[in-house]
Amino acid sequence: MALLKKINTQVNRIMKNSSLVQNICFDRVPLFIPRLSLTVKYCLAVKLLIYLLYCWYIYSEVPSASSKFRSFTFGCVVVYHNKFFPRFIRTHSINSIRTFSKFQVIILFSIEKVTRSESKNHSYSKTDISDLHQGYNNPPSRFISR
């Protein structure tokens, strides 16, 4: 975990020095947009990997956490980076995905929720992992109790 924190700090430092990153609303600019420099693309990819590793750490090292909470946490980590996904992924509605597994439903529900809440304030400067857990402690039971 200490190594992940060091890498995250270095990535944040590089991204802070990029004026382009500060002026982009990532909800509308996927990772593959050519305006982003190669360095910034690598930084964003590394940050995504860091969050996924952090979540894997929670999943494997905290046996007392329920599987529902761990799955939901992983969904939130993936969803936190939904700004890098193609637009069509974010526009799927929950009602049209009945054939998906519970885990995918949770992820897509989170994508809808995060996209709605983040589109109001457009503040993407906070990258602390604790931001991922705000508002997700009580997931709707209809999506995970089946």
UniProtKB/Swiss-Prot annotation:
Its main location: cytoplasm. The chain crosses the membrane at residues 38-60. The keyword Nucleus applies. Keywords: Cytoplasm, Membrane, Nucleus, Transmembrane, Transmembrane helix. It is found in: Cytoplasm; Nucleus membrane. GO terms for cellular component: cytoplasm; endomembrane system; nuclear membrane. It is a single-pass membrane protein. The keyword Iron does not apply. Pfam families: Pombe_5TM. Belongs to the UPF0742 family. This is UPF0742 protein SPAC977.02. It comes from Schizosaccharomyces pombe (strain 972 / ATCC 24843) (Fission yeast). The lineage of its organism: Eukaryota, Fungi, Dikarya, Ascomycota, Taphrinomycotina.
